[in-house]
From Swiss-Prot:
Domain ABC transmembrane type-1: 95-292
Protein name: Glutathione transport system permease protein GsiC
Membrane-topology annotation of the record: Multi-pass membrane protein
Spans within the Cytoplasmic topological domain: 1-8, 124-134, 190-228, 299-306
InterPro entries xrefs: BPD_transp_1_N (IPR045621), MetI-like (IPR000515), MetI-like_sf (IPR035906)
Length: 306
């Protein structure tokens, strides 16, 4: 297992290098001139050229790329073109709100989704199954931005129960986490149901029932463990998507996180911040998938990695 983990970690190096090359080319193909945006609409050509020199944008593209890669290897992600602060500081100040929002969304989505999926599988083709799957389809179909605006209108504007802006207290997390986790809960419900339907028909489930074990214990002890392997895969993928895909939700709720920072950076063509954020999202996604693979062996001892 240790050798497998080490090999996967070493595989990060070429993957992140390829991602860094693609991201560098992508951001430099974005329409718009960062120097013009930073200098302002009233700046003349001389001022814009001076800003370009200060930002290093007057250098050849290959020289900019080498400067970017060599600094990144040393842990220096550069300076933000807009704030002139270190990119690492910009990301660090926004990371925790996004992480806590992701964890909050994932926790309730997994609990609700798995419970709905198990109930739907146990009472298959009956009203609990139909109700759970109807809610799940609705959760997948409803766009996140529309759900967010609906929740704001009802619970903040009309009822005045919950705040909409900021991340200072636990109340601020309720509406964004509901919005962000709705689709995940729906996916988890459908995936858990499909996995449990297969497990419930296995011989060991019938054997446990024949021994007089209660149905609740059969489902939770014998069914849950064996149905968890494909579900854990989906959990890992969804967590990665949540961590890097909260851009729309953070924009709707004006959330002070990485998604909002990325949107602002794209609008201002802040190349160093864009590059660093996408690299960070790629690293997070790869590490989450590694953790999921390791969890396979913990859930099912029959699985071993070499």
């Amino acid at each position: 297992m240790l050798n497998y983990v080490i090999k996967r970690l070493l595989g990060l190096i070429p993957t992140l290098f390829i991602v860094s090359v693609l991201v560098f080319l992508f951001v430099h193909m974005l329409p718009g001139d960062p120097a013009r945006l930073i200098a302002g609409p009233e700046a003349d050509a001389q001022v814009i050229e001076l800003v370009r020199q200060q930002l290093g944008l007057d250098q050849p593209l290959y020289h900019q790329f080498w400067h970017y890669i060599s600094n990144a290897v040393q842990g220096d992600l550069g300076l933000s073109m807009v704030s002139r602060r270190p990119v690492a500081d910009e990301i660090a100040s926004r990371f925790m709100p996004t992480l806590w929002l992701t964890i909050t969304s994932m926790v309730w989505a997994v609990i609700f989704g798995m419970a709905a999926g198990i109930i739907a599988a146990v009472w298959r083709n009956r009203w609990p199954d139909r109700l759970s799957m109807t809610i799940a389809v609705s959760g997948i179909s409803f766009p996140a931005f529309a759900l967010g605006m609906l929740l704001i209108q009802v619970f903040s504007v009309e009822l005045g129960w919950l705040p909409t802006v900021g991340a200072d207290s636990w109340q601020h997390y309720i509406l964004p986490s509901l919005t962000l986790g709705a689709a995940v809960a729906a996916v988890m419900a459908r995936f858990t149901r499909a996995s449990f339907v297969d497990v419930l028909s296995e011989d060991y489930m019938r054997t446990a029932r024949a021994k007089g074990v209660s149905e609740t214990w059969v489902v939770l002890k014998h069914g849950l463990r064996n149905a968890m392997i494909p579900v854990v895969t989906m959990m890992g993928l969804q967590f990665g998507f949540l961590l890097g895909g909260s851009i729309v939700v953070e924009k709707v709720f004006n959330w002070p996180g990485l998604g909002r920072l990325l949107v602002d950076s794209v609008e201002m063509r802040d190349y160093p911040v864009i590059q660093a954020e996408i690299l960070l999202f790629s690293l997070e996604f790869i590490l989450i998938n590694l953790v999921v693979d390791v969890l396979y062996a913990a859930i099912n001892p029959a699985i071993r990695y070499k």
